[in-house]
């Protein structure tokens, strides 16, 4: 049922991940769409290509805003815009209805069987997997997802069926007005400290969301998650409606949907498990995306799809084809320092390679479609850790002094210039054949910006390093999150060999908390080498360190490097820029 839409809706912040799919759905239903955004972006380009007029840049004078709003029925404003934003003020002065995203979603989803996928982490992946499964089953859903999914052609899908899959965010109460037929809660953890003062307030929001399931609906939850357990306990205390029975999933022995015999293979991106439903084996789940958390997301999809009439065997088959979403453990490219010296024996199975190999399509697309530049606010003038010889190139990030090696610290000694410290007191990992190739750098980009997300992402990466060093580059996202979750960030990088922390991406905030990236550098537990690098220097520093580590007849890290860029801001531009920098001759 493609709903017919007749209103002219003007979206403020139309290029954002929250509003761009809503604009596409409204447009697909026959409605008229226009909008504005502070920055140009691929999403803006997509909308313009479909005939949507979009003004990019700062808000103009009131007279011009009024002209842009002529004929508009409703203005939908991003939650990132303050009430005193000139375009919101102008719209109200013209007597137009101004709605936030949270207020528009019930209107957009009315008349559908709504599957609302909520949770502190994993929403985008779960929503994308579920949409792919439902489409393959011929149910032709409409969907709004918080990430670009190449298999779906973007972050929105306008289907003809009566199902609507909606990634449902707790931020700003975005899911508060929904009435889902099926509600999914992947996990519940303290996040968005700018609006949730503590974990209890987050749980209160999810409890209210869970109680909004329609009569005859279902509540699908991860039974292994302690935050979910707290929400269920509160629902029980309040009296859970019989109309919304709870279906749980996880690794626990008493889960209705359970994964057992979990297997991950070093150097392999796949995750596998045997799936039990009600204690009965229904098949093997194989995913082309890594990590135990991916298996949990897939279990949620199995539970929902089965309730909607899709056979588990068909769901398993479709899940095996899922290739991932943008910025979710996304391959950026790889670079090879050069063909190894024939006098130096390579690890068994390693093949000779041309001097440079990379993924030009991925790198070029990211370089041209993502904004390149510093974070929203000027980088703070913090303490840059000292650099050591040789003078021709920057030395690796200086090591932070660490206590004696023990269960919480990888090594007591700082890394020497041009070398990588051992991950353990017993010495470096044994070099083995690298699936990408020795003397190589592989770059993965991930949206992880919460300690739990970082921990899970690095665990998945560590399982596939295959003899390579694991480097993590973090751009903290928002001052409030960085300050509130600093202790969590400090212990989230235990799987990394080296950590670079750059300037905080401000997003919608101003710096009034007095925190700096060096606060994290001083607290990091686990990695042997850590350091703060100002944003303007980051790519040059990484390029120098990569060359220094991989170059020479006997590289300091012969197995290669797996480098992860982590964060929700402009850090996604670093991978393509680093590949470009490595293509240039080294200074000398």
From Swiss-Prot:
Keywords linked to the UniProt accession: ATP-binding, Cell cycle, Cell division, Cell shape, Cell wall biogenesis/degradation, Cytoplasm, Ligase, Nucleotide-binding, Peptidoglycan synthesis
Pfam family membership, one: Mur_ligase_M
EC number from the UniProt entry: 6.3.2.8
InterPro entries associated with the record: Mur-like_cat_sf, Mur_ligase_C, Mur_ligase_C_dom_sf, Mur_ligase_cen, Mur_ligase_N, MurCDEF_pg_biosynth, UDP-N-AcMur_Ala_ligase_MurC
Pathway the protein acts in: Cell wall biogenesis; peptidoglycan biosynthesis
Compositional bias annotation for Low complexity: 344-371, 382-411
Biological process, per Gene Ontology: cell division; cell wall organization; peptidoglycan biosynthetic process; regulation of cell shape
Molecular function GO labels: ATP binding; UDP-N-acetylmuramate-L-alanine ligase activity
Protein name, per record: UDP-N-acetylmuramate--L-alanine ligase
Species annotation: Frankia alni (strain DSM 45986 / CECT 9034 / ACN14a)
